[in-house]
Swiss-Prot record:
Positions contributing to Mg(2+) binding: 16, 54, 115
Protein name: ATP-dependent dethiobiotin synthetase BioD
Alphabetically ordered keywords of this record: ATP-binding, Biotin biosynthesis, Cytoplasm, Ligase, Magnesium, Metal-binding, Nucleotide-binding
Catalyzed reactions per annotation: (7R,8S)-7,8-diammoniononanoate + CO2 + ATP = (4R,5S)-dethiobiotin + ADP + phosphate + 3 H(+)
Source organism of this protein record: Caldicellulosiruptor bescii (strain ATCC BAA-1888 / DSM 6725 / KCTC 15123 / Z-1320)
C-alpha cells in the first residue's frame, strides 16, 4: 500500500490545509487519492448533526469520493485531546476499527493521505491507566510520516523536539512541509536551520493565506497549491508514499 501520515508540530499549523492541497495537487496529476482522518475533536454542529469539518473541507476541495463519517470514524465535539473528549462522551476509540477502515480504504485508492489529530505525542485513548498514543497508531498502520511546521517564533524548538521524539520511538519521518510561508527575510534562515539540524528533506514551502479558514476561496487556494506543489515538489513527495 502507499500512504503517508501527516502530523503537526503543534495545533493550528495547518495540517488540514496541507492535506487538502496535497490531495488536490496529486489528483490534478492524475493519481487516485484517498483521505483518512481517524480521529477528530472539536467538531462543529450543523443543526443536530456533528460535522467533521476538516474531513468535509478536504473531501469537497479535492473532490474525493467517500462518506465523511467513514473517512473519520471517531468524531468528538469537545476541542480537547482525543482521550479526554472520548472519555467525556463515554466512547471507546476502537483501534481495530481504525485499522480495518484504513485497510478497506487502501484497497480503493492508489495513495492515501492520513491526517493525524495533532502531534506525535497526542494520547488517543486511556485504558486501565495505560495511554495509547498517536505515534503507536502510526507505527501500526503506516510508519511513513510527513511533518507540517511553520516559521513562527518557537518553531525551531518545536520541530527539533518532534523530530527527536520520532527518532526515539522508531518513526520514519521522511519529510517536512513548511506552511504559512510569507517570504519574509528570516524565514529561510529558520527553514535552513531546521534542515541542517534534522537532515530531513524540506518537501515544500506553502504560502500563507490570510483569510483561511474564514474565507474559502478555492481559486486562491488552487493558485497557491499550483505554485507550492509544483512538479519538483510532487516528485519529492511521491517518494514518501511507500509503507
Amino acid at each position: 500500500m502507499k500512504a503517508a501520515y501527516i502530523v503537526g508540530t503543534d495545533t493550528d499549523v495547518g495540517k488540514t490545509f496541507i492535506c487538502a492541497g496535497l490531495c488536490w495537487a496529486l489528483k490534478e496529476k492524475g493519481y487516485n487519492i484517498g483521505y483518512f482522518k481517524p480521529v477528530l475533536s472539536g467538531a462543529k454542529r450543523r443543526g443536530k448533526m456533528l460535522i467533521p469539518q476538516d474531513t468535509e473541507f478536504v473531501v469537497n476541495f479535492a473532490k474525493i469520493e467517500g462518506d465523511i463519517y467513514r473517512l473519520t470514524p471517531f468524531i468528538f465535539e469537545k476541542p480537547a485531546s482525543p482521550h479526554i473528549a472520548a472519555s467525556d462522551e463515554n466512547i471507546d476509540i476502537n483501534v481495530y476499527q481504525i485499522k480495518q477502515t484504513f485497510e478497506d480504504l487502501s484497497q480503493n485508492y492508489e495513495f492515501v493521505v492520513i491526517e493525524g489529530c495533532g502531534g506525535l505525542a497526542v494520547p488517543l485513548k486511556e485504558e486501565k491507566n495505560q495511554f495509547y498514543m498517536q505515534y503507536q497508531l502510526i507505527k501500526e498502520i503506516c510508519n511513513n510520516v510527513i511533518l507540517v511546521t511553520t516559521t513562527k517564533l518557537g518553531t525551531i524548538n518545536h520541530t527539533l523536539l518532534t523530530v527527536e521524539f520520532a527518532k526515539a520511538y522508531g518513526l520514519c519521518l521522511k519529510g517536512i512541509i513548511v506552511n504559512m510561508y510569507k517570504n519574509e527575510p528570516d524565514e529561510d534562515k529558520v527553514i535552513n536551520t531546521i534542515a541542517k539540524f534534522t537532515n530531513i528533506p524540506i518537501l515544500a514551502k506553502v504560502d500563507f493565506i490570510n483569510d483561511f479558514p474564514s474565507d474559502v476561496d478555492e481559486n486562491k487556494f488552487k493558485n497557491v497549491f499550483k505554485k507550492c506543489f509544483d512538479d519538483r515538489a510532487i516528485m519529492k513527495i511521491m517518494g514518501v508514499f511507500e509503507c
